[in-house]
Amino acid sequence: MKNWIGIFVFALAGLTSTQVAGKPNILLIMADDMGYECVTANGGESYSTPNLDRLARGGMRFEHCYSQPICTPSRVQLMTGIYNQRNYIRFGLLDPAVTTFGHLAKRAGYATCIGGKWQLENGLKGPNHFGFDEYCLWQVTRRP
């Protein structure tokens, strides 16, 4: 796959079953610039994706969706669950007043973590403000 390092991965997971009694771990993956046909579990033959195939076999698959043609608005939409025409303030801004899936997971008793490309300009409001306990991200602030 072209530049797997550039794949954007959101990960949200509960730490242990004792901390989140009876609740499943949640792993959400959003890949930047990756087509449906790039995963062998979807019938693709151009790449070998055994780990993604294993996750697809053992988890819930989200196969019918719409996305923006560029990555930053897609991330804002995924974080908020709100279509871009309703949550848009300006390009790449995640509104500090909005509730994200990180907030919702924390309210449900999950420990939260996010990894990958952030690139959501929001001044002094970083991932912790948006409901994430831990993070390993690049492009946390916008380049000048």
Model-predicted segments: where are they?
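Formylglycine-dependent sulfatase
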Residues: K2-I5, L15-P144
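Hydrophobic alpha-helical targeting segments used for export or membrane insertion
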Residues: F10-G14
